[in-house]
Design a protein with these regions (language model features):
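Anionic group-transfer/hydrolysis microenvironments
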Residues: 49-51, 183, 224, 275
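Intrinsically disordered, low-complexity terminal tails and inter-domain linkers enriched
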Residues: 300-318
Length: 325
């Protein structure tokens, strides 16, 4: 990927933040809005809220997302593609992109709970430390996203579920979308949080998540692509976007799994980040263009959509898992 390597290329953002912090609110108020969501049109949202949870790794590179200038470069390349409908980001990244004028005509989803830091001793106590519903309304955002990891063996799960339900209600009161990303999760033998990606586990997490809050009128699901995806999508009537997660396997395998899943009823599109922002070959524009070409192009589903994170067939005794997003 060919990028501008001038270390001062974003120095103006620091200057604006120092001298004119109200510029963020003005940029949000004056930006051109997305024309709106329509049934039958799948949407493409780029996700960039991982650093706020201390999750900087991509594949084997533990600090891949550490350089903010590099990340902003990659995000601007992705957002420049007219097929990309919007952004999902933490407040710091969202504000940078607003100041850069990169969000004109885009959907905006804020990341609400980043308190469950990767590796934290009580990681399942995933507190709402990011965007609030009120802040998202003030930004003119379209909704908020919440990671909802459910660990049946951890008492902090109940507090996270309660906080998620309250956030869903707060968003719904403002007619904003609640994008809920549920997982059944466990700690492995080394104490690392991992998500259970068997279809039955994903289906159970969906059942729990879609029942949160006093209304589901504005609730969406954000789900992984796993083996037996038809059964997963049969478990909900809520609009659903597909997440990418930390890429493993070849890019061709990842894209093929997305294409199959995008053909299923109820799937509204993609909300992915690291797979496209940090592709194996470094070609961000190419990866984004390929992903965009999958939207609305898939024919009727004829078999299982097998995601790259699924690991073993559904009949295997081995539990396919992936580190949390």
């Amino acid at each position: 990927m060919s990028l501008n390597d001038d270390p001062r290329r974003y120095e103006h953002l620091s200057r604006i933040r120092l001298e004119d912090p109200e510029a963020v609110a003005r940029a949000a108020a004056t930006r051109r809005r997305h024309p709106g969501l329509k049934h039958g049109v799948q949407n493409f949202i780029v996700a960039a809220d991982h650093p706020a949870r201390g999750a900087l790794s991509v594949g084997p590179e533990p600090m891949a997302m550490a350089d903010r200038r590099d990340l902003l470069d990659r995000l601007q390349i992705a957002l420049a593609n007219p097929a990309v409908d919007g952004i999902l980001a933490s407040p710091d990244i969202m504000d940078d992109l607003l100041l850069l004028g990169a969000l004109d005509g885009k959907l905006i989803f804020g990341s609400m709970n980043r308190g469950g830091l990767a590796g934290l001793v009580n990681e399942f106590d995933d507190r709402f430390t990011g965007h609030t519903a009120a802040a998202l309304q003030a930004l003119g955002a379209d909704g908020g996203k919440m990671l909802t990891r459910i660990c049946l063996g951890d008492p902090d799960t109940v507090a996270t579920l309660e906080a998620t339900a309250k956030a869903i209600d707060s968003l719904a009161e403002r007619k904003l979308i609640a994008m809920v990303e549920p997982f059944l999760s466990v700690r492995d033998a080394h104490g690392k949080v991992r998500n259970d990606l068997r279809a039955d586990a994903v289906i159970k997490s969906v059942g729990i998540a879609e029942g949160l809050g006093s209304t589901s009128a504005y609730t969406w699901m954000k789900l992984p692509v796993v083996a037996d995806m038809e059964r997963v999508m049969a478990s909900t009537t809520l609009p659903t976007v597909l997440l990418g997660g930390d890429p493993d396997g070849s890019q061709d395998e990842v894209f093929a799994s997305w294409q199959a899943a995008l053909a299923l009823p109820g799937v509204r599109g993609l909300t992915v980040g690291r797979t496209l922002l940090y592709p194996h070959d470094g070609d961000v524009a190419g990866a984004v263009a390929t992903a965009a070409s999958l939207l609305n192009n898939a024919g009727p589903a004829t078999g299982s959509a097998t995601g790259p994170a699924a690991g073993e067939p559904a009949s295997s005794d081995r539990i396919p898992v992936k580190v949390s997003e």
